[in-house]
From Swiss-Prot:
GO terms for molecular function: serine-type endopeptidase activity. It catalyses: Cleaves type-1 transmembrane domains using a catalytic dyad composed of serine and histidine that are contributed by different transmembrane domains. This is Rhomboid protease GlpG. The lineage of its organism: Bacteria, Pseudomonadati, Pseudomonadota, Gammaproteobacteria, Enterobacterales. The chain crosses the membrane at residues 94-114, 142-162, 169-189, 192-212, 229-249, 250-270. The active site is at S201, H254.
Amino acid sequence: MLMITSFANPRVVQAFVDYMATQGVILTIQQHNQSDVWLADESQAERVRAELARFLENPADPRYLAASWQAGHTGSGLHYRRYPFFAALRERAGPVTWVVMIACVVVFIAMQILGDQEVMLWLAWPFDPTLKFEFWRYFTHALMHFSLMHILFNLLWWWYLGGAVEKRLGSGKLIVITLISALLSGYVQQKFSGPWFGGLSGVVYALMGYVWLRGERDPQSGIYLQRGLIIFALIWIVAGWFDLFGMSMANGAHIAGLAVGLAMAFVDSLNARKRK
């Protein structure tokens, strides 16, 4: 699959896709922040891009409208929903994204009811040698959050970045990034502060690093992160390291997570180039 272009206007993208269908080229539309056009048969990429250039010069050409009539797509392509916020949540998040979000919320509620310490006894990084074979602990520390702001901040980024990775690269890729970054960021953080920590931020930083570098080195992957946001992430790490806001931050997890994401993106982008 090759992403050809993105359109902000669904009417325009549908007209182009319908026209190409009349020319024997099948394109698909994926709705994210914009309407992304994907081509399954990459051997036709040059032809599609040439036609796209002609289309952009005059999208109102009668032949494009005629193609839409022929395909039966004369509507706006817009679907108005009563609850656009929840529709946006659903469209961007795949099953793994949802499972992790729900797990974090359930654990957060349990911590409010039972207390932080009680839940940490079951989910925290192994704090005693006898617990080292309770393998879930190397990952479940990422599900624990200690304030409403903590969980909201992490889940917003998880939904935004994790959802993009899952939608574009598949659930398997998101699972691999999540497990590796949770394990390694947790290992580094326990070296910094001991086993009593929690939060999804190590995984979030891994996703930030991955999405940014993969988008820079492999634009055809269809994922990207604005450079301003990765700069924000670096500033936040520096602020946490020097305790500029007086907040307790898992600095080791943040740095390790970012490094893991960058490393995985570098390897994946190299592999993508070799396949071309």
